[in-house]
Structures are given as C-alpha cells and as structure tokens.
From Swiss-Prot:
Domain of life: Bacteria
Function: NDH-1 shuttles electrons from NADH, via FMN and iron-sulfur (Fe-S) centers, to quinones in the respiratory chain. The immediate electron acceptor for the enzyme in this species is believed to be ubiquinone. Couples the redox reaction to proton translocation (for every two electrons transferred, four hydrogen ions are translocated across the cytoplasmic membrane), and thus conserves the redox energy in a proton gradient.
Organism: Sodalis glossinidius (strain morsitans)
Protein name: NADH-quinone oxidoreductase subunit N
Designated gene of the protein: nuoN
Cellular compartment(s): Cell inner membrane
Family classification: Belongs to the complex I subunit 2 family.
Amino acid sequence: MTITPQQLIALLPLLIVGLTVVVVMLCIAWRRNHFINSTLTVIGINLALLSLWFVTQNGPMDVTPLMRVDGFSMFYTGLVLVASLATSTLAYAWLAGYPGNRDEFYLLVLIATMGGILLASANHLAALFLGIELISLPLFGMVGYAFRQKRSLEASIKYTLLSAAAASFLLFGMALVYAQTGQLSFTALGQTLNDTMLTQPVLLAGLGMMVVGLGFKLSLVPFHLWTPDVYQGAPVPVSTFLATASKIAIFAVVMRLFLYAPVTHSDTVRLVLAIIAFASMLFGNLMALSQSNIKRVLGYSSIAHLGYLLVGLIVVQAHTLALETVGVYLAGYLFASLGAFGVVSLMSSTYTGEDADSLYSYRGLFWHKPLLSSVLTVMMLSLAGIPMTLGFIGKFYVIALGVNSHLGWLTGAVVAGSAIGLFYYLRIMVSLYLSPPENLRRDMPSNWALTAGGVVVLISSLLVLLLGLYPQPLITLVQLAYPIL
C-alpha cells in the first residue's frame, strides 16, 4: 500500500517519538552526556505534543488496518505524552546521582511512550497486543533500573514474571476470539458479534482470558497483587509512569474495543466486570488504610480509581456520557498522580539515598516547606474527590453515570469507596501539619520550585485547582475527543 502525506501527518506523534529514540541512541553512541540526552528527550516529547495540532487539522482517518487516528486517539495520545514528559523531567534529578549508565533510561521511557501512542490509536487486536508489549518491555528495565538496590530488583522480577503470564493469557484469549469470529479488527468484531454468538462458551472463555490479561495491566482485583510491591520498589519516576501513562493508554484501548464490539451485551461479561469493579473499589481503599508507605498508599488507591473507571466501561455502548466520564476522570487522575508522585520525587534524595516514601518523612513538612505541603494537600484532596478540585468533577461524573445507568449497587460502592479513601488521604494531609520530629534530615534543595521537577509539580497543582473550579475547557476538549463509529 502507498502511504499518503495525510497518513504521515496522522502518524506524526509516533514518528517524532520514534525519531527521538534514534537521535538519543546515536547521541549516546557518540558521547555520553546526561544533560544533552535528557534535553533531547524532553524536546522530542514536546514536539510530539505540538504535532497533535497538525493531526487535528488533518481530520480523522484509518491510517492502516491496525490504527485509527481520531479525536479519541489524539486526546489519549496527549495524556500519555504529558505523563512521559513529567516522567523524563522528574527522572533527571534522580539520575544525577546514579553511578551507572544514565542515558539509557530516557530510551526506555521513549520506547514505552511509543507503545502508549500505538495503544491510543489501536483499532485491531494485533495493535493492542503490540502496544501492550511495547509499553511493558521497557518497563521491566525501568522498574529494575536501580538494580543495585534489592527492592528495585525484586520489583522488576515480580513485574516481569507476572507480566509474561498475563501476556500469555491475553494472547490465548485473542486466539479463542479469532477462532470463534474469524475477525481481529475492532470494527469487524462489532459487525460479527451478535447476541447468540455472545453465549458461545469458546468466545466467553476467550473474552475471560483477555479480561485476565488486561486486568493485570490495569491492576484490577484479583490481578492486583504486584501493584503495591512494584510501586514501592521502583524508582519514583518509574512509579509515576506506571501509575499514569501505562494505565491511561491501556484503558483507552479497552474503551475503544468495548465501544466497537458489543461485548457488554453479554450478561456474563457485565456481571464479571461489575464484580471486578466492586472488589477493586472496596479492596483498594480498605488495603490502603493500613499502609505507612506513601507509594504503597498510591498503589492501592490506583486500584480503587481503576475500579471507579470500570463503571464507564460497563455502560460504554449504552450511554454517551460514558466516554465523557472516562476522559474527565483520567485527566483528573493524571494531574493528581503526577503532582503526588512529583512531591515524593522532590522529597527523595538522588539515587544514592532511600526514597522518602514513609509517612514519617512527611511529618511536619509544612513548617519547613509550606508551598510543597500545600501542593501535596491539593493532590490528596483531588484524589479523594473533594469539591473545588478536578478529582471531584471526575467523581461526580462517575456517580451521575452510575445513577443514569441504573447501576445502583456499583454507585453505592463508588460512594462507600470514596468515603473510606477520604480517611487515608486525610492521614497523609494531617501528618504534614503536625510538629516535625527532631532528628529527621531532609535532602531536598531549598529552591525546589525552580527545578524542572518543581515546575511539573506546580503546574499539575494549578491545573487540578483551576480545572476543578472551572472545568468547562476540559469538558469541551473531552467532548471533541470522540471516536469515529
């Protein structure tokens, strides 16, 4: 097939990130310079973000049988690129004290970003699998990048082994779906699947295995066991990427699959997803109550947040509000997570020391760093879904969608989960304003707000507050980000 200029423009973000990978690789071969390679990475991701404007002017289209570029893919590509940009920026300070080769970290981030962009545009089960592998394989290396530290190496081994098992489930599930339908394209599956076919045991087994594989990647109960350990063991910038870019990209492709293929018309699939959502909301929040490590708290809370999002996934075919709900919620979750992990990253010393991830490290922080404490407070309020933050707008959408779709018990679980969540978010906030311990030494620089990581954290907190007070620009953007049906 011949590729037209319009198709090349549609692929611009992917091509620019791919070109950045090549440039950074050549630069490493020529001369190792941490500052130059990190700058090239940030420039490449910014150019990819700018190229989205040209893609918008180009209009929606099917670029290849595997990829469909439309408003939906552009919105989620933008979110993935923002998460990657924040990860690269936060990683610079952490890598400054790293004794080994630092530059390869940026290559891994860029390759994983390509996987995220591919997932946002995927319109085919082959593209779904390629995208998931392209985002997962670099993450194995990123999670274990601090391999001299036992916990990082342990987290990497856990994630690699469980991820390989989940990928085999996903692939076998796809094979069963293909055996029953003879189709791999999302749109073709939508035309082929009907109510009688959705009762076939082979097809249900295939869909079940796909749910297992995707549930692992999204850390949904009961496939969540790796999440707190990996979040705690991985370097903070990697935990940031894992919690944001990876989850957003995979949820976007699952939304598109469920939107095109009428999978949720099957009562069995709906019931299974509803049980997973219910368990994720309650289990994620209840387990976070007993944690004294902030990275583990954020890990368990991410399980609960993905549980809330499943409400949108269950009714995505029946309700036009579902796409809007998921878009607003994921944007709020992205900025709140970037801010929260950003504060942990700024508080942690460079590679040489331990991450400042125990709640004890944050006790009395307000009396030393009032602005940083205020930022973390805003992020916790947003994650808890308190009014005047972007997190509240997302939570409000989820509850409204649940009520409109007559999902009474799931809506009740969202409210109950949010109430439980408020307790452990408040615990973190209260510790910031207690009297500081005498013998606690903090390594962070006094001018943190002027560092690149500080700018990321401040921008995230401003967006959480401004869009929480006036969410209309985000809602308009999400309404424009509608897939071709």
